């Protein structure tokens, strides 16, 4: 068990407008590598925000300030034992080639509501994009700038130089 320190925002890296199911996420992450998966023991995210703004729980968790072993997800190497991970469906252009902020208005509203509610419940959280911890464009938007725009306190914004953006 470790202290919960971070909320890391991800995208599914799927083409703009293409919906994704939780079963697809589970397959992508937990199927063996020879069957097209990553071979992980568990999924990489706690929740997923669908195109219509619906937030679907993928891994249950409690609301305390700790990550129990059963709550760990595989969202960012080296950070999983102290982070919660949320993903929005999308993140690349319609051709599936370039990183793009494809969040629908409903997804933006849902993510904003989620972040604000959870920083109230977890005031110690620092919120980051996956790109802060891996050489990826994920979640395909500037998390720090967006957090400032929606009025998140500076103490809750992870500000270390990103790996990629």
Model-derived segments and spans:
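Short Gly/aromatic-enriched secondary-structure transition segments
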Residues: 22-31
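Extracellular protease catalytic domains of secreted zymogens
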Residues: 36
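Active-site-adjacent loop/helix micro-motif of nuclease/hydrolase catalytic cores
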Residues: 17-21
């Amino acid at each position: 068990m470790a202290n919960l320190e971070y909320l890391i925002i991800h995208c599914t890296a799927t083409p703009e407008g293409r919906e994704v199911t939780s079963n697809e996420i589970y397959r992508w992450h937990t199927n063996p590598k020879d069957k097209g998966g990553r071979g992980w023991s568990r999924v990489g995210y706690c929740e997923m925000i669908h195109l219509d703004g619906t937030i679907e729980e993928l891994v249950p968790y409690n609301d305390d300030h700790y990550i129990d072993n059963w709550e760990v997800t595989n969202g960012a190497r080296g950070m999983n034992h102290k982070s919660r991970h949320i993903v929005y469906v999308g993140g690349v252009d319609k051709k599936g080639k370039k990183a793009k902020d494809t969040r629908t208005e409903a997804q933006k509203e849902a993510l904003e509501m989620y972040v604000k509610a959870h920083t109230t419940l977890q005031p110690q959280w620092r919120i980051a994009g996956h790109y802060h911890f891996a050489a990826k464009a994920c979640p395909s938007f500037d998390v720090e700038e967006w957090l400032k725009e929606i009025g998140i306190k500076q103490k809750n914004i992870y500000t270390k130089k990103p790996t990629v953006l």
